[in-house]
Amino acid sequence: MISDKNVNQVLKDDGVDNSLLEPGHKYENVSTINIKQIEEELEFKDSWAVRVIYNKRFGGVIIKQNPGEGNRLHYHPDADECWVVLEGEYEWQIEDEVSRVKQGDIIVVKANKWHKITAVGDKPA
C-alpha cells in the first residue's frame, strides 16, 4: 500500500488521464469556481481531475469518474481529506469499513487512514 505524495502519478495509475494539477493554472485558488465551465473549457470527455485549491492548510481537487473507476487503497500522511459527492455514487472504503455514498453526502478521512473509492451505479460520479 502506498502514500499519495505524488497526486499526478496516483491519478494516472488509477486511470485518470485528463488532469490539471500543476500549480499556477487559471482555476487554482480563485474565489469562485464553476464546474460546468471547467468541463466546457477543457473539453474533458471522460474521467478527469482539476486542482482548484492548494495552500499550506488545504487542498481541493474536483474529480469525475465513470462507473467502475476509482483509486487503490492509499493514505495521506500529512492531511485529512474531505469529499463532497456532487453527483453519482461511490463505494467508499475507510480502513475495514465499506459504505455507499451518493449525491449530497460528505465524507471525511483522517490522516493516515487507509481508504479507497470506486464509482458505482449507472452514471459518472
Positions of predicted regions on the chain:
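A short, N-terminal "cap"/entry segment at the start of jelly-roll beta-barrel domains
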Residues: 1-59, 72
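A short hydrophobic beta-strand segment most commonly corresponding to one strand
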Residues: 62, 108, 122-125
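Structural motif
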Residues: 89-91, 98, 114, 124
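Short, conserved beta-strand element in jelly-roll/cupin
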Residues: 63-66, 75-93
